[in-house]
């Protein structure tokens, strides 16, 4: 019988990228059409949100079982009904969701090229890997940063893997200089920087929201300055923390519990799951909330997106302007919110 995880991985690999293109093209087309024919754009964007729900349905098992990421798995699962609900609200006249739709289009335009254009992916991944290595050196360590195939070859030699098995292992990742190689008590440990480790996903989210709202470029630039560079820098810190913790096995906390929780039999992976999946991802949520606050302070227009998101997730209305004590955005940019506020 086929391994369920392998089945999920095969389905994801086959449909994720084509679905992503359909999602981005649909949102982009709908956002452009909005300038000329809002009602026809509404229909197209409602369909785009439906496809977006399918996209997240495919991502959920990938994150939960293949990547073994609790935070991303749950987030993807929640995104399925949330996307359908956004489409429902947009269909019934919640015009502020045009802003959120434009944001999704802009996010995709930023993110997808790094995901599918190999030279761009290689440049970003290797740049982040080099800067992570520099960060590790600041801690007084001398990391070994090598191409993945070389790391796979070294691993195969140490573990006594056969030539065919080693060659197959070397094909797991692209031939980028993006892998930190450690040996702990004679056992090889590798930490490979992938596109998901570059922070491009989070940066694309903020870039998309900033681009989607209608506001002066000067304030958009300030919002960009307090979000994108901060995310990039903190992501380097995150990679340094994970590489050092995993490579040196510094995070061997409650190994039996962690191995059970993440479904692994390799005790050395405990440090990785604790450092990345538990500590780093939990702190990332806190950091993104703080950055959202900074962006809202500089660009109050994004409050409509934040308030709509909170309404969609909780079903309750929130007054972000009062809660964060920020100036109200230009009334001329106001739209009908998801909860109906702003409707004339």
Name these PLM-found stretches.
Residues 1-344:
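Hydrophobic N-terminal alpha-helices or hydrophobic patches in metabolic proteins across all domains
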């Amino acid at each position: 019988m086929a391994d369920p995880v392998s089945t999920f991985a095969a389905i994801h690999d086959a449909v994720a990228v084509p679905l992503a293109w359909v999602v981005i093209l649909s949102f982009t087309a709908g956002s452009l059409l909005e300038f000329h024919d809002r009602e026809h754009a509404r229909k197209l964007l409602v369909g785009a949100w439906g496809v977006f729900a399918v996209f997240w349905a495919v991502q959920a098992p990938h994150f939960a079982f293949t990547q073994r990421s609790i935070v991303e798995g749950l987030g993807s699962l929640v995104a399925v009904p949330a996307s359908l609900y956004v489409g429902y609200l947009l269909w019934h006249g919640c015009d502020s969701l045009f802003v959120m739709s434009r944001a999704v289009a802009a996010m995709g335009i930023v993110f997808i090229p790094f995901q599918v254009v190999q030279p761009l992916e290689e440049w970003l991944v290797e740049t982040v890997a080099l800067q992570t290595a520099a960060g590790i050196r600041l801690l007084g360590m001398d990391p070994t940063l090598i191409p993945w195939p070389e790391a796979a070859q070294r691993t195969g030699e140490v573990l006594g893997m056969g030539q065919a098995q080693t060659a197959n292992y070397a094909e797991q990742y692209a031939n980028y200089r993006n892998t930190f190689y450690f040996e702990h008590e004679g056992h090889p440990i590798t930490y490979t920087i992938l596109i998901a480790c570059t922070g491009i996903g989070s940066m694309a989210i903020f870039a998309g929201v900033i681009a989607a709202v209608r506001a002066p470029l000067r304030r958009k630039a300030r919002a960009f300055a307090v979000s994108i560079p901060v995310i990039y820098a903190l992501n380097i810190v995150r990679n340094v923390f994970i590489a050092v913790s995993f490579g040196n096995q510094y995070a061997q906390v409650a190994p039996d519990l962690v191995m059970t929780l993440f479904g692994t039999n390799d005790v050395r992976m405990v440090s990785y799951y604790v450092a990345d999946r538990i500590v780093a991802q939990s702190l990332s949520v806190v950091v993104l909330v703080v950055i959202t606050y900074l962006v809202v302070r500089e660009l109050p227009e994004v409050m409509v997106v934040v308030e709509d998101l909170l309404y969609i997730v909780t079903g309750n209305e929130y007054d972000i302007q009062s809660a964060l004590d920020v100036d109200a955005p230009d009334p001329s940019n106001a739209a009908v919110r998801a909860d109906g506020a702003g409707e004339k």
